């Protein structure tokens, strides 16, 4: 019985995805869908989206994000752009193993640096 503005960011995101799915589209565009929520809610929403994608195998999700970790986690194919130009379009594993441009290599280096940081904390 709450008004939309009284819902948390995560609740609003879930409702937005549910409303879009109710129209039964073949393709869904998600533009920074988890950008305005805390890290815990973001992870929950990412996991829920993965589950939905598996359950509704006939759907294509186009996810726009500035978070390379999110793109690699959720994407079966990832398109990396720099200044409006396509740098690479591949599976996440291929991008990690074989970056095609200096920009992509630098992006991958940030992922590896973050991994090293978290490893050091253990």
Where are each of the predicted segments found?
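Conserved catalytic loops of ABC-family nucleotide-binding domains
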Residues: 45-63
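ABC ATPase "signature
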Residues: 89-90, 98
């Amino acid at each position: 019985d709450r008004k939309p503005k009284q819902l948390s960011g995560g609740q609003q995101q879930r409702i937005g995805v549910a409303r879009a799915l109710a129209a039964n589209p073949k393709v869904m565009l998600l533009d920074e869908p988890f950008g305005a929520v805390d890290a815990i809610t973001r992870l929950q929403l990412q996991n829920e989206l993965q589950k939905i994608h598996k359950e509704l195998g006939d759907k294509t999700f186009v996810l726009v994000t500035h978070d390379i970790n999110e793109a690699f986690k959720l994407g079966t194919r990832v398109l990396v752009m720099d200044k409006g130009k396509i740098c690479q379009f591949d599976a996440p594993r291929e991008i990690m193993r074989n970056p095609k441009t200096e920009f992509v290599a630098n992006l991958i280096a940030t992922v590896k640096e973050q991994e090293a940081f978290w490893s050091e904390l253990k």
